[in-house]
Regions:
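N-terminal membrane topogenic signal
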Residues: 4-15
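N-terminal hydrophobic targeting signals that begin at the initiator methionine
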Residues: 1-4, 107
């Protein structure tokens, strides 16, 4: 008994150390980087109080973001230091996710609890979400808390746990609609048997849980339904394809285990788990809980003609089960091949490889910006002249610039851009601004900007790498600035969304820019 107590005490101390290290890794530089585009949406959505949120959603019931996270972050309004204040909530819940995954993993097997916590603590992907003014770290915490009480109910059959499961799952719904597949399909766990002595769950428990979830979510569902009057759900400017099922699945694996050798090892472990495990039904259920939400989202995208990319962040609630399943598979592998345990511990080796793979990219992540709109706006305000044209591509970049220019939003949480039909298949979007008495124009168009060059205007271009290369084929532009965004958690982690600032100045055609090639 004394030995067990010492083991528990040592594991508890290791967990405390793990949480402290995790906090330090998430706190470091968390408020130093410029907002990227999605964070700018968040801070704009967080300015309204509860009354303001209700009014906005009444007018915009199909808005794709649920309101709870905005209401929580509003408590830090008026955001005296926005880059810090908006990221405090994700930082807190990102850190709390470490002990939460430990508690959840312990429900499946005590031997995988600490490995799961260690893997998450050093995971650069999760560190980035904990420093991101979005709801993903909160979502993961709420999902793990709901799963924890779900398994506790399966173990004990106590009805009180169902209320807690319903509360956490309902908070998931109010935080992000992307959690709906997880809420629905994680209930495959009703067939999971956590121990030999666990009673078989009753159908009444299933009805109680789902009745409570429906009861808690119904007010918002009715509110949205009552105020829906045929508004469009998807922004018509979003034309991205979600991709094939294989593309989405690879994206999830790529982001969660980063490097190809680890991706291959993880896939093999997931495949071998039902074969090696003594409890095959449980193994298949865990795998289904991870894979089915991805399948569900893919089917939804195909049936609804969903025009948006699908990222691993949409499946953040499944990530804890993913790591738990990997370590359970490693447990089964070690039991099956006990002879090899004398030479090396496969679970220990896998943890080392996971941590090492993340430590390789972590310094690069810390040095890089998310999407440096702040630096871009500061540069432009120092060099802009009266009559200048600022051409932005893609159009969404306008929002980032206007935020850091200090331009206010309309009541519809959008910027009032002028729209002008310049040809049968092209519209120009523009806004005129004043800075220190200088009037200039920020605009987006596909090709109409060529006219400004032909008219002899001084034209700036704020573009991504691909567009910068294309424009340079036709005009000898000067590269005036590079604004880093090389390690952003966007479609993939990392995604390079760096911006290039080019200048066409007819009065200084030979002007030199920064010594950097666009490659």
């Amino acid at each position: 008994m004394a030995i067990k107590d010492k083991v528990r005490e040592r594991e508890f101390l290791l967990l405390i150390l793990c949480v402290l290290v995790a906090f330090a890794l998430r706190f470091y530089t968390f408020d130093k980087k410029s907002f990227w585009l999605d964070e700018i949406y968040t801070i704009e959505d967080s300015r309204d109080d509860v009354k303001g949120q209700i009014k906005f959603y009444k007018d915009n019931p199909t808005y794709l973001q649920a309101p709870l996270f905005f209401m929580i972050t509003h408590q830090l309004y008026p955001f005296t230091k926005p880059e810090r204040d908006l990221r405090i909530i994700p930082l807190v819940f990102g850190t709390l996710s470490i002990p939460m995954i430990y508690l959840l993993a312990k429900q499946f097997s005590p031997s995988v609890a600490l490995p799961s916590a260690l893997s998450l603590a050093f995971m650069t992907y999760h560190i980035s979400l904990s420093q991101d003014g979005r709801s993903y770290s909160l979502l993961m915490f709420l999902g793990m808390a709901g799963l924890y009480f779900f398994i506790k109910h399966l173990e004990t059959s106590k009805s009180g746990y169902l209320l807690l499961v319903a509360l956490f799952f309902s908070m998931l719904f109010y935080t992000s609609y992307s959690s709906i597949p997880f809420i629905a399909l994680s209930q495959i766990l009703w067939f999971y048997k956590p121990g030999e002595v666990a009673k078989k769950p009753t159908f009444s428990s299933f009805l109680i849980l789902n009745g409570l979830i429906l009861l808690f979510c119904l007010p918002w569902i009715l509110f949205v339904a009552i105020n829906y009057r045929g508004q469009t759900i998807m922004d018509p400017l979003h034309l991205e394809s979600p991709g094939s099922f294989g593309y989405i699945l690879y994206g999830v694996l790529h982001d969660w285990v980063l490097h190809t050798p680890l991706i291959i090892a993880s896939v093999l472990l997931l495949i071998l788990f039902p074969i090696l495990s003594k409890f095959r039904r449980n193994a298949f259920i865990l795998l289904a809980t991870i894979v089915f939400p991805i399948v569900g989202v893919y089917i939804f995208c195909k049936l609804s003609d969903f025009s948006h990319f699908v990222t691993s962040r949409y499946f953040i609630n499944s990530m804890s089960l993913f790591f738990i399943t990997l370590f359970l598979s490693l447990n089964a592998l070690e039991v099956k091949f006990q002879t090899f345990r004398r030479f090396f511990r496969m679970k220990f080796l896998f943890i080392i490889l996971l941590i090492a793979s993340n430590l390789v990219i972590l310094p690069i992540y810390y040095r890089s910006e998310k999407q440096d709109f702040r630096g871009l706006a500061n540069y432009l305000t120092g060099h802009i002249r009266a009559g200048d044209k600022v051409i932005v591509s893609p159009k969404l970049y306008i929002r980032g610039l206007l935020y850091y220019f200090g331009i206010g939003l309309s009541e519809s949480r959008d910027y009032l851009l002028s729209q002008r039909r310049v040809s049968d298949d092209e519209t120009e979007y523009s806004i005129s601004l004043f800075y220190k008495g200088n009037k200039f124009t920020v605009s987006h168009s596909k090709t109409y900007w060529n006219r400004y060059i032909a008219e002899g205007n001084r034209v700036w271009f704020v573009v991504d790498k691909k567009t910068a290369k294309e424009i340079n084929k036709f005009y000898p532009l000067t590269l005036k600035g590079y604004f880093d965004g090389s390690v952003l958690n966007l479609v993939r982690f990392p995604t390079d969304v760096s911006m290039y600032l080019l200048l066409w100045d007819p009065e200084a055609p030979g002007e030199k820019g920064i010594n950097m090639s666009i490659e």
